[in-house]
Regions:
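Structural signature of transmembrane alpha-helix termini at the membrane-water interface
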Residues: 41-51, 112-115, 135-145, 199-209
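Membrane-proximal N-terminal segments immediately preceding the first transmembrane helix
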Residues: 6-16, 77-84
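N-terminal signal-anchor transmembrane alpha helix
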Residues: 22-51
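Cytosolic juxtamembrane amphipathic/interface segments immediately preceding
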Residues: 10-23, 175-176
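Long, glycine/tryptophan/cysteine-rich extracytoplasmic
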Residues: 42-96, 142-181
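Hydrophobic alpha-helical transmembrane segments
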Residues: 29-38, 95-116, 123-134, 188-195
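Cytosolic juxtamembrane helix at the C-terminal end of the final transmembrane segment
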Residues: 20, 147-154, 193-218
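Mature, soluble, non-transmembrane domains
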Residues: 117-151, 171-172
């Protein structure tokens, strides 16, 4: 192994050390693997749901967000939004949805790769996955704000509704409508994965830092 590669990946664990303290080195690997698996599972799970309460629909209308699509009463909600000048929901986050599946798979691969890196560079590999839940919420809030603040002035009810920002995490109200958001399974799987990554980093540092320091000061 070249010196540059060794600086990046870190020292190998001596066979006698691995035999004596096997759990110390396996725990961070298992935590990283579990985090990667949860992210992969989250792709098929819903991340966020919005209930729209409207006088015309006593039971409410629902739209459910997966990482790569929106399902539910999308057409009905678009029909109501048309009157206040809001764009169709399928125009939101088109780029994000197109890369989401491959992006999450790539994040999971980086987490798995982190199990083979024994230096501080491991943090860079897992950092994107660590902040994925925050990135998801921030992007979702961006699009909600973008749609709510850019209403079509030519819409039938545009004069009766001021631009607004629909909240992503709490109840919102506009005219006679109210929105009730809810975080779902996919999001919580990603949050759990982030927690496993944090714990994995703790055990990773505890396991490999002594080896790195010993390599620097033989």
């Amino acid at each position: 192994m070249s010196s540059d590669m060794e600086k990046l990946i870190g020292p190998r664990v001596p066979a006698d050390e691995l035999k004596a303290h096997r759990a110390r080195y396996i725990i961070p690997t298992l935590l990283f693997v579990a985090a990667a698996i949860l992210l992969i599972i989250s792709i098929q799970q819903p991340w966020w749901r919005l209930k729209l309460n409207a006088p015309q629909y006593p039971a409410g209308l629902f739209v459910t967000a997966f990482v790569n699509q929106m399902t539910g009463d999308v057409a009905e909600i678009d029909g109501l939004n048309h009157y206040i000048g809001m764009r169709p929901l399928n125009e939101a986050a088109v780029f994000e949805q197109s890369i989401s599946v491959f992006g999450i798979i790539a994040l999971a691969a980086l987490i798995l790769a982190a199990a083979f890196v024994h230096t501080k560079w491991v943090t860079l590999l897992v950092l994107p996955a660590l902040f994925l839940p925050v990135i998801f919420l921030a992007d979702l809030q961006f699009w909600l704000a973008n749609f709510g603040l850019n209403l079509d002035p030519a819409a039938p009810l545009s004069s009766s509704v001021d631009p607004f920002i629909p909240p992503v995490l709490w109840v919102g109200k506009i005219a006679q409508f109210s929105t009730v958001p809810r975080l779902l399974t996919g999001f919580w799987l990603a949050v759990t994965a982030s927690g496993l990554i944090l714990v994995g980093l703790f055990f990773h540092r505890r396991a490999y830092k002594p080896l790195v320091e010993a390599q620097k000061n033989p």
